[in-house]
């Protein structure tokens, strides 16, 4: 099966903490990890791992973060021919805080994802 996924590509920063902070509050986190993410990239990777031949269509910036955001997709064999860097833009970033119950808060700086258009 061949599949094309159109969507966001980000680098995620994930912090775990016993509980989520309230407005204006600082809490101490247990861990901080960074890894490739984005709704589109996650779907492309999942479909590929289930056996599909996947083409990812998305935007990354022309910054050092772009390669890190694409690394897992590339290493696992997702086709990235339609994920060329966009000059003058940063790659999307997500800040994710997860508590002990699995609840989360997410802030996304979309970067090049926001510049995606029909001509891409």
Region annotations inferred by a language model:
Residues 1-59, 64-75:
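Glycine-rich phosphate/adenosyl-contacting loop at the front of the ribokinase-like
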Residues 82-86, 96-120:
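Conserved phosphate-binding/catalytic loop of the ribokinase/pfkB sugar-kinase fold
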Residues 33-40, 87-89, 113-115:
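Short C-terminal domain-edge/linker segments immediately following a structured domain
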Residues 72-88:
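A glycine-rich helix N-cap at a beta->alpha junction
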Residues 53, 79, 103:
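Residue-level detector of anion-binding/catalytic polar loops
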């Amino acid at each position: 099966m061949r599949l094309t996924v159109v969507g966001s590509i980000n680098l995620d920063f994930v912090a775990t903490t016993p509980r989520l902070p309230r407005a204006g509050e600082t809490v101490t986190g247990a861990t901080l990890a960074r890894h490739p993410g984005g709704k589109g990239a996650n779907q492309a990777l999942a479909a590929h791992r289930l056996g599909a031949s996947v083409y990812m269509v998305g935007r990354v910036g022309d910054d050092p973060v772009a390669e890190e955001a694409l690394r897992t997709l590339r290493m696992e064999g997702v086709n990235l021919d339609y994920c060329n860097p966009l000059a003058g833009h940063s790659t999307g970033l997500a800040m994710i805080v997860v508590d002990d119950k699995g609840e989360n808060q997410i802030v996304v700086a979309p970067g090049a994802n926001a510049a995606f258009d029909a001509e891409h």
